Amino acid sequence: MAIYTGIGGSAKSVSKIYIGVGGTARQVHKGYIGVDGVAKKFYDGGNPISSFALGTEFGISDPSGNKTYWYKLIHKGVPGGGLYDSTANGAWLWRTDIAASTSISNNYIYGYEGWALDNWCVNYPGGNIKSSVANRLMTVHLPYVKQSDDSSANVSSGSNGLSRKCFLLSAVEMGIYTWQGIDGLMAQEGAKLDYFDYTTAATDKRKAGDEYWTRSKRTNNGNYMYAFYADGSFCNAGYREDSHGLRPCIVLPLNTLVRTVTFWGAEFNYID
């Protein structure tokens, strides 16, 4: 549903409407007018992403507008465990498929920060997310093990976490207990996100087209990062020289509006 305004003698579609509330511009979600004593909707800006169920998928186009990539809602709000601060209070969206594949390094590694997996995620939004959405990505403080703490597995969290707009999920965030790592060698890098279940077994919630990386490294062993197999089961032996998939996660404000389109009886949700 669209409304138009006249500009230079031409009708131009209005994508968003704002009203002033307490001196602040607030975006209008829906607009109504009275017709024969009945309220008729003349504008629908969409529904806030917070109103959608976990597991719902959303399409976001790339900067060219020629491709649409799909993301699944896996958490709303700040995850539990006390390891996140208010920067995580948003809608967590996880790429539904593998976006790319890479190995990590030919040499011993000391963590996630600054290595191939992290660097790829840092550069991901610029080439894969349209600017109107990329500009709204939240910078989240992620629980992580600093390179200098590699041998002790001390987790930096809250305001001391790793600041990122795009990142890989940790194994813990996807439902793995730390003691399920090799000999317990997994740091507590976060808490389980609400969409996932506690299991190391195959699950559709983690299924993908191929094996893919997490941001969790085996404690005190720079040869391995934890990963998941294509069927969603836990892989504790992702060797740094092997090439595996990448499934980025982004976080948007909970009031982000979603446009829903019905096509042949099916609903598709888009973030513009």
State where each predicted segment sits:
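Intrinsically disordered, compositionally biased repeat/linker segments
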Residues: 1-43
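Collagenous Gly-X-Y triple-helix signature in extracellular proteins
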Residues: 43-272
